[in-house]
């Protein structure tokens, strides 16, 4: 009887441990969580595409505007810069893109002050069109990591379409993807630690 109790306790402990590990490996929305170190490892296997929602919008905040009312706040600019410093610690080489709105261009510019931002209006088209925009960029830069600043509805669409999950990104939340044999795969949600 004691042996059965010990086995039961061990089994329950093991299941609890699995639950804790799973909680840290998966987001509450069902997407795998990909931190900076994991992203760096993925980028060694194949070039990655990281899509970020723009930083805090000026027109939806009481925080001080960076400049234009259609752009981002000073806080948003500082948050984008902080994210850029964290991410580029491990991912040194990448091309940087933004949709053609002030808020995405400012977010990308503050993310990496030393990089040229390529503006492409196609990153504002959400739905299946976002995939052709990503593929076009991937074709132009086949062996490079790509970072794109876009919009929450684009990220929500990708998560729903690729993984059938609801994803409601906050400012500067991101998704990690890669292209394999011409097909786009959603690897998971980028998380900051």
Swiss-Prot record:
CDD domains: HP. InterPro entries: His_PPase_superfam, LipoPS_heptP_Pase. Keywords: Hydrolase, Periplasm, Signal. GO terms for biological process: lipopolysaccharide metabolic process. It is found in: Periplasm. The keyword Hydrolase applies. Belongs to the phosphoglycerate mutase family. Ais subfamily. This is Lipopolysaccharide core heptose(II)-phosphate phosphatase.
